[in-house]
UniProtKB/Swiss-Prot annotation:
This is Ribonuclease HII. The gene is rnhB. One of its GO terms (biological process) is DNA replication, removal of RNA primer. Its EC number is 3.1.26.4. CDD domains: RNase_HII_bacteria_HII_like. HAMAP family: RNase_HII_B. PANTHER family: RIBONUCLEASE H2 SUBUNIT A, RIBONUCLEASE HII. It catalyses: Endonucleolytic cleavage to 5'-phosphomonoester. Belongs to the RNase HII family.
Length: 260
């Protein structure tokens, strides 16, 4: 009789829930074998579910491929809501029908997985561009216009095997340029190209905020990335406003008025 270790090795070779060998393993009454069978089936089902999810997230891209477009760029931004730091956008062109496991809207990816998936995107992407708009410029033009500026900058910054996209998939934004484009609500959850841009923008901005935390300690920028957490608000009260704070955002706007 095969040991449980040997059976686990045999189960690892099965990748189909309809494989006829399941019957043999399911007939083994040992609890360890039954646990191994359940675990392996769970893994296979998770893989199948992930494949379906990735296929669904490629539906916009596949439709565009059929129309003749090749260099399809996903565009997304992070940093609209924080009280400090830049708004950062990324433009990413992935290879045709490229699938990256667990790539999703960056807000849905566990933080500990951000760097890993970011590296996978960077490794396979045909081209990546980054746009960064400072808090000073955000105050001058407003966050909506600053977001558009960051996205346009990301397109112009494209570096890699492709220098110019022939179609843009954008997360909930219309850019007034001649390149054909689609604005997709919650695009980072529905398009793999936009999801790739989302994680690139997120990791890029997080790294910037970690750097700012060293320059301006006491606000917790490495942890809150500029959002208005308790530590951040307490830092504003005790240390004041830094050059990277957005002066048109509350409560900073009111704090500056009171001082004047």
């Amino acid at each position: 009789m095969a040991t449980i270790k040997e059976i686990k090795e045999q189960l690892a070779a099965i990748s189909d829930l309809l494989d006829p060998h399941w019957t043999e393993f399911e007939a083994d009454a040992r609890s360890g074998v039954q646990a191994a069978v359940r675990q392996r089936k769970k893994i296979i089902q998770a893989d199948l579910d992930e494949e379906v999810r990735l296929e669904n997230m490629l539906r916009y891209e596949k439709d565009l491929y059929l129309q003749g477009y090749q260099a399809i760029a996903g565009i997304d931004e992070v940093g609209r809501g924080p009280l400090a730091g830049p708004v950062v956008a990324a433009c990413v062109i992935l290879p045709k029908n490229c699938k990256i496991r667990h790539l999703n809207d960056s807000k849905k990816i566990p933080k500990k997985k951000h760097e890993e998936i970011y590296k996978q995107v960077v490794k396979v992407a045909l081209a990546i561009g980054i746009g960064r708009i400072s808090s000073e410029m955000i105050d001058q033009v407003n966050i909506y216009e600053a977001t558009k500026m960051a996205m346009l900058q990301a397109i112009d910054d494209l570096q890699g095997l492709v220098s110019r996209p022939d179609y843009l998939l954008i997360d909930a934004m219309n850019l007034g340029i001649s390149i054909p484009q689609s604005s997709i609500i919650k695009g980072d959850a529905h398009s793999l190209s936009i999801a790739a841009a989302s994680i690139v923008a997120k990791v890029t901005r997080d790294r910037m905020m970690i750097g700012y935390d060293e320059i301006y300690p006491g606000y917790g920028f490495a942890q809150n990335v500029g959002y208005g957490t308790k530590q951040h608000l307490e830092g504003l009260e005790t240390l004041g406003v830094t050059p990277i704070h957005r002066r048109t955002f509350e409560p900073i706007k009111s704090m500056l008025k009171e001082k004047n």
